[in-house]
Amino acid sequence: MERYLNPNTKKWDGPDADYTPESDDIPWCMEPEKKITVEDVKYVLSSHYQGTIYDPYGGSGDGLQRGRYRSIGINRNDFLSLIQMRPDQPEDVSVIQWIAFASNAFNVMVPFYPGVSTTPEYLSNTGKDVSTDNFYWSSRLVA
């Protein structure tokens, strides 16, 4: 997460990296180098060490390295909700709740506005039976 939001603040690669996955002194938080977007939050919460030897879904590295460290974006993460507040917008559309079902590494976020009183059937009628007729189950079937 810090590597993605702060790619230039620290040295992240090589034998002289400031931090490695086994460092005991990784900062709890850092100020990001740029303003964080909704897409940045989604990417971080979907992260699974992609592009590294530790990626549990990737093909690089050996079997002992892949999945060695627990990533955020694993298939057991079932739901994401993000509130976006936009003070520069009219009040009735200034807040958006972004919702995503199923594993964050494989899902997509859908915007919901608080002022909207109805939701399309595909998004609202989940049902207890698995079906591709609704967004919830379609998302769950991907992962």
Sequence positions of predicted segments:
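C-terminus-biased signal that marks the final domain/tail of proteins
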Residues: 1-143
